[in-house]
């Protein structure tokens, strides 16, 4: 399928894309948190930020920025530490809001919907490993002798975005359903938010120690 457009082993790529999307990461966790805390609208706003951020990274990967980042340690480290700092900031913010909330559930903390989108977008864009991954993964399924490799790259990128949309939609709808349950379980909500905050701190530490 899509062989005429320079795509190699599309079905193998699709299976790989599904497994990649299923691996939990900060983007997925952020979408899930907002779907639980702000419902379907909050979840999809976070997902839109992730989709647009990923699309930008995929375009940059195709444009050759990935090679520049990989061969320029200073640039890689700047993006890496910015990403780690932002993850740490989000984790600390969640933990602080959870631990300082008293007479109400932590999920009631109001965050403007616009801020949810912006945070998701920044979270997606400040991951230097993502852009390097797109190149290393996509190149395995592109016929470099094809006349228009841009079309091949676009097909693979679109496929990954569709798979991501389906998975995140499942998380959003599930999270919104869970909201009705934990809405009356303040202790459970606090424990859940605390775990999410700690996971963001953990992601920050892992990103800060990654090498190009």
Curated annotation (Swiss-Prot):
The chain crosses the membrane at residues 12-32, 49-69, 81-101, 120-142, 153-173, 188-208. It catalyses: L-leucine(in) + H(+)(out) = L-leucine(out) + H(+)(in). Pfam families: LysE (PF01810). GO terms for biological process: L-leucine transport. One of its GO terms (cellular component) is plasma membrane. It is a multi-pass membrane protein. Keywords: Amino-acid transport, Antiport, Cell inner membrane, Cell membrane, Membrane, Transmembrane, Transmembrane helix, Transport. Disulfide bonds: none annotated. One of its GO terms (molecular function) is L-leucine transmembrane transporter activity. Exporter of leucine. Belongs to the Rht family. This is Leucine efflux protein.
